């Protein structure tokens, strides 16, 4: 579905990614793990065209995306949930969710997808009239993911969904990712909580200093000695 081949990218004179290649197949949950500053967020920003790659090829299904502007990426079925969520704090939960269905094809299925989001996040149904800015951190993350799902994406990009959340809330967020995987959603998730994300992912890539250092089945990486020592505290 998604294929990156030899992607390099950066900001100004700083290069953040070096010759990165990865794939996400339909129905997979794929994790990108690594330390702070490894280039994980930059990778998602390249995919959603918030920044341009300086080298390499980016493709979604049969479409080359290198020259596609950022506002058009949603038309190719890619939805991005950024690390800071970027909700509209003075709008209600349901109004925020409605913002995710702004493209014509999504507007036509608003009611159906709203019910799907409420089924996935029952708390959002309870809070639907509440201002998004008054939600807890975990509830805001659920709302942000729900808003992205309202577009009916083929691929969901999640940037550090557990960042800044209490452990019990982190578990709830990963339970949602697990449910999305079971329901056939395709997810590319960037995450520093390696122990949790390798439990829900099918495959994973280790990104360090802007380069892919390891890749494989998530279950295999959980048993990798270097991963255990550096990221799992074992």
Where are the regions that the model predicts?
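ABC-type ATPase nucleotide-binding domains, specifically the catalytic core motifs of the NBD
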Residues: 12, 68, 93-112, 120-125, ...
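Conserved ABC transporter NBD signature motif
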Residues: 56-64, 76, 109-114, 216
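Conserved ABC ATPase signature
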Residues: 131-135, 139
């Amino acid at each position: 579905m998604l294929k990156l081949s030899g992607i390099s990218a950066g900001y100004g004179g700083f290069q953040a990614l070096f010759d990165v290649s990865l794939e996400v197949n339909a129905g997979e949950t794929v994790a990108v793990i690594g330390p702070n500053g490894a280039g994980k967020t930059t990778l998602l920003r390249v995919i959603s065209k918030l920044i341009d790659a300086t080298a390499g090829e980016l493709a979604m299904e049969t479409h080359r995306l290198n020259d596609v502007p950022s506002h058009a990426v949603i038309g190719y079925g890619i939805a991005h949930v950024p690390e800071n969520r970027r909700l509209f704090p003075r709008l209600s939960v349901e109004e925020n969710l409605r913002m995710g269905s702004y493209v014509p094809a999504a507007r036509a299925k608003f009611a159906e997808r709203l019910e799907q989001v409420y089924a996935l996040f029952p708390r959002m149904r309870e809070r639907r009239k509440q201002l998004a800015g008054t939600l807890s951190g975990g509830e805001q993350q659920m709302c942000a993911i729900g808003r992205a799902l309202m577009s009916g994406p083929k691929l969901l990009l999640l940037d550090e969904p557990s960042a800044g959340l209490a452990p019990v809330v982190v578990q709830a967020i990963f339970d949602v990712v697990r449910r999305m995987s079971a329901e056939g959603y395709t997810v590319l998730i960037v995450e520093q909580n390696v122990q949790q994300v390798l439990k829900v992912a099918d495959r994973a890539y280790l990104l360090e200093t802007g380069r892919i250092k390891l890749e494989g089945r998530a279950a295999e990486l959980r048993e990798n000695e270097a991963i255990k020592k550096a990221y799992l505290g074992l």
